[in-house]
Curated annotation (Swiss-Prot):
Its cofactor is Mg(2+). PROSITE patterns: ENOLASE. Mg(2+) binds at D246, E292, D319. Its EC number is 4.2.1.11. This is Enolase.
């Protein structure tokens, strides 16, 4: 008979994230004395349909960003509703909190409160059962290490002083033989890029996610600079590394309204069809394998056209489009919008709902990418999640800043634990034609 891991108490506290803003940390205590801890991350560019992060809005504390209400909800309502529940049944744990919240977007108790507790309960259960978190969440089938999607140049709203409209330019080490080696490759390219930027007299200070934010003039210049860094580090673009981009184009609002896009920095205006052709030309010119949020989160018709145009050879990732939400993902699958989903725990607000979103994506042939937020903590749950459900890709910043590197270091440990059964998929992590 399986052990019943009774929850005895839950406590919350206000801690700081990597941007110096408050966030929620929770601890779940089991009757056997085990403790699990979890923390909620926070995003800078947030999708309109994300679960609600509860903030105090008291301007006298942390500029209104305090989370004492969310913490109080953990110490009272959540503590009461989880008393006596089995922590190993993550669906029951999350269902109890969602029922106590009573809203669709978790705005009553706060998605940040619910998520921190959801992670803490899963961790407590895995510790009590003496198994790694990835095994607890995914069973014995989780053995694939993810290919990193490393953000090394920032643009858009992550780098307001540059001329780059695309929010993130990333490298993906598709030709590496193992996770340990892929991490080395990426670090070497990162340092080669730093050297190139220094030679040009450009800034090498890092942004929220560890990437550089140099004053480059255009998106194409950013791509070409990255390819130069790949070669300088001794690798071959296309074979060893592919490029991924996060356009975050829901931020590109035009006065002309829906179906139109205006690049805030370049000033160029596009219709959805013109923007699709812009992406197609970039993909023909450069070894781009993935584009995230290439169109607005409500432009479903445009997304279908984009997928028809590029979906057979480029990974088209919905972040703001799907917000880790099974209802929106289901609509996308039905329409043929995109072919991949970015998985962010705090967009939906619980571990069990995140697992369901990944399972739904995989069932429909979509790839899933385990992702961080720009405001992160030392919590490494997304690393375990990537292996648990074989997402095969992870997006968690540059090989710089300890809250980003913590996830990569956890994946190194997992690869070591898995030993001979560990698989690094490389180019096979994608569901597109890679000829």
């Amino acid at each position: 008979m399986a052990a019943y891991l009774e929850i005895e108490k839950v406590i919350g506290r206000e801690i700081l994230d990597s941007r110096g803003n408050p966030t929620v940390e929770a601890e779940v205590y089991l009757a056997d004395g085990t403790v699990g801890r979890g923390a909620a991350p926070s995003g800078a560019s947030t999708g309109e349909f994300e679960a609600l992060e509860l903030r105090d809005k008291d301007k006298s504390r942390y500029l209104g960003k305090g989370v004492t209400k969310a913490v109080e909800n953990i110490n009272t309502v959540i503590n009461d509703c989880l008393f006596g529940i089995d922590a190993s049944d993550i669906y029951a744990v999350d269902a109890a909190m969602i029922k106590a919240d009573g809203t669709k977007d978790k705005s009553n108790l706060g998605a940040n409160a619910i998520l921190a507790v959801s992670i803490a309960a899963a961790r407590a259960a895995s510790v009590s059962l003496d198994i790694p978190l990835y095994r607890f969440l995914g069973g014995v089938s989780g053995n694939r290490l993810p290919v990193p999607m490393m953000n090394i140049i920032n643009g858009g709203c992550h780098a307001l002083s540059s001329g780059l409209d695309v929010q993130e330019f990333m490298i993906m080490p598709v030709g590496a033989p193992s996770f340990k080696e892929c991490l080395r490759w990426c670090a070497e390219v990162f340092h080669a890029l730093a050297a190139i930027l220094k030679e040009r007299g450009l800034a090498t200070s890092v942004g929220d996610e560890g990437g550089f934010a140099p004053a480059l003039k255009s998106d194409e210049e950013a791509i070409e600079t990255i390819l130069q860094a790949v070669e300088k580090a001794g690798y071959k673009p296309g074979r060893d590394f592919r490029i991924a981009m996060d356009a975050a184009s829901s931020e590109w609002k035009s006065e002309k309204g829906k179906g139109y896009y205006k690049l805030p920095k370049a000033g160029t205006e596009y219709t959805a069809e013109e923007l699709i052709e812009h992406w197609a030309k970039l993909c023909e010119k450069y070894p781009i394998i993935s584009i995230e949020d290439g169109l607005d989160e409500e432009d479903w018709e445009g997304w279908k056209k984009l997928t028809d145009r590029l979906g057979d050879k480029v990974q088209l990732v919905g972040d703001d489009l799907f917000v880790t939400n099974t209802e929106r993902l289901s609509k996308g699958i039905e329409l043929g919008a995109g072919n991949a989903i970015l998985i962010k725990l705090n967009q939906i607000g619980s571990v069990s709902e995140t697992l369901e979103a990944i399972k739904m994506a995989h069932k429909a042939g979509y790839t899933a990418i385990s992702s961080h937020r720009s405001g992160e903590t030392a919590d490494t749950t997304i690393a375990d999640l990537a292996v648990a459900l074989n997402t095969c890709q992870i997006k968690t910043g540059a090989p710089s800043r300890s809250e980003r590197v913590a996830k990569y270091n956890q994946l190194l440990r997992i690869e070591e634990q898995l030993g001979a059964s560990a698989v690094y998929p490389g180019i096979r992590a994608f569901n597109v034609n890679n000829d």
